Amino acid sequence: MLFLAGVSSLMCSNQTPPGASQDPTGGAASGGSPAAGNGGSTAAVGAGGATSALNPEGGAANGGAANGGAANGGAANGGAANGGAADGGAGIEAGAPADLGGTSFGGASSAAGGAASAGAANGGAASGGAAPMGGVSATSASVFTRSNDLQRSGSNLKESVLTPAVVRSAGFGKLFCKPVDDEIYGQLLYVSALDVGGQKRDVVFAVTMNDSVYAFDANDAEAAPLWHVNYTDPKKGITPVSTGDLSGLACSQYRDFSRQIGITSTPVIDPNTFTMYLNARTKENGVFVQRLHALDIRNGEERPGSPVKLEASVPGTGTGSVDAKISLDPLLNNQRAGLALHDNTVYLGFGSHCDGGSYHGWLLGYDARSLSRVVTYATTPNGWGGGIWMSGMAPAVDGEGFIYLTTANGSADVASGGGDRGQSFVKLKRQAQALLVVDWFTPVDWSVTNLEDRDVGSTGALLLPSSNRVIGGSKEGVLYVLDTNDLGKFNENDNAQIVQTVPVTGERRSHIHGTPVYWKSAGGEYVYVMPEEEHLQQYQVKEGKLILAHESEVTSPVDHHAASTTMPGGILTLTANGGVAGSGLIWATTPIAQDANQQVVSGVLRVFDANDVTRELWNSEQSANDSFGNLAKFNPPTVVNGRAYVPTFSGQFCVYGVGATRR
């Protein structure tokens, strides 16, 4: 269902929009009168711009036809071919395959240490400079993918407006908020100078747990959405998955998500084709479905052949196998990791819900044009678990096309030469119709941490652009620094074979959920991380190792409730004007005080001096007008072109910059 006119904006509100928390179905709001169409791609615009409370029926409100547009982008059972290519195997052990080239996301040639998104080298938001992109600006910054680039640096190095002095000024604060129909789990994406309806606009994109996608003018506080598409139709029995559907299958009472489970991952945008790729989950008259959608970012219309069902099976005797095959389960498999786009292939990683049921970790690759499935990798084909969730991070890709990811609780038979890779760093290479496992690292204590839910896979992988290093954290409170040319595989005695093990929490018990971020400044190279119940930590990179340089005086909140630690710590974004000394800022979203594990809690945005993180410059609790509401767990702020865009679980995202009103 596509709406080209919609709800009005919520100006500078510190409160939850009407119905956003209370409404059990979180329906889409819309002005205008969508006409019935195929795939949500056809809409007639009626009296647009009408303000609407969230519709408790889940359909269009204020005059929009409740059944307008075919639900889910086509036939209820998937429309286009279900995944296309044949299963691809469970992953093949191999030596390093032939180089497939370093074509980066967006078409730029690869740089040393990792291809940059759409031409942004060595981290930072994509600027698009390597190739003409039509309506997408080649000079302003954009954010097309989770944490800004394929290295997952979390850095926008084209920020010249927001400086430490500006953030400290009296005029910096919340400018406005924009309402959406549910919680926002995927990172907000941003495209500068996009041609929408013949007008150049900076556009911010939001996806919600009510299976909605929104496009907003990033600078207009009052405008309705440029377009809005929703993949549900309650009158036809098509809704998001609910947490109740998982109770008893994943934990006795499932609470990792609060109500609905729609779009849980960060989409990815190809600026050369103006296409967004995303996964939407639905329950259709009792049948659970996940679909890959390809949308035109200029109008929300489906691309030809979109959507396709996400389905896969590979040979294996692991848990849940039937006839010596394991299969992706559309209910049990949680597509939490952000999507990645590389070399014309869209990658989706799958974990679990609360380690429940007979699940396995999966990485599926789809051709970006045909949407046929071209590669399949299962992490534990002959075992169990090994989910790829990474607290929402997307797989990293280096300049040679190698893919890096981490896996969570599960079996790891690496000591005996098997292929199950739970609790591991995994390095993959696309070769023809297969994903080859070319290297891995499994910590010596994996079986102990497995039993205690202290898995490796709680962060993604950060590739350092300046060297052959990859870094990731764990629920054990440890950062692992690995050599990308030799990850270390497995040593039954210790972890001495890897570059470095860095305990970042006092008793190795506080989890790390935020993948570290990176900055190469005039004063040196730095990596930043903010674990649960810990200070923001700044490490200098020297000779390929991490040396603690500074710790903030502010901790991520400490929850003294018995048997609980404050989750998830700080989820970070870095901005700077290249490597200019004194230009760097660390932006962190954290809970204000409570633990965000299995509950929704209030959040705070904090800004630190990236040159010396002992200096907190500003936070959103200093003025009542700056609060954004409930924390979007695991979701970083998107900071670009002089503004910070903060997702929330309060049915809105909020925008910060210069020109805030004080009261």
Pin down the residues of each PLM region.
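Mobile, glycine-rich extracellular loop/lid and propeptide segments
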Residues: S140-F490, R508-Y539, G569-A576, L585-Q594, ...
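Intrinsic-disorder/low-complexity coil detector
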Residues: T16-P17, D23, S33, N55, ...
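A beta-strand-loop signature enriched in Asp, Gly, Thr, and Trp
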Residues: D494-Q497, Q537-T575
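Short, intrinsically disordered, charge-balanced linker/junction segments flanking boundaries
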Residues: G134-S137, P557, A581-G582, T590
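Sec-dependent N-terminal signal peptides
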Residues: M1-A5
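Ser/Thr-rich, Pro/Gly/Ala-heavy low-complexity intrinsically disordered linkers and tails
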Residues: V7-T139
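Short, contiguous acidic/charged loop-to-helix segments that flank catalytic cores in large enzymes
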Residues: P503-T505, E551-S564, I592-N597, S623-F628
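Surface-exposed, extracytoplasmic segments of Gram-negative outer-membrane nutrient-acquisition systems
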Residues: N485-V504
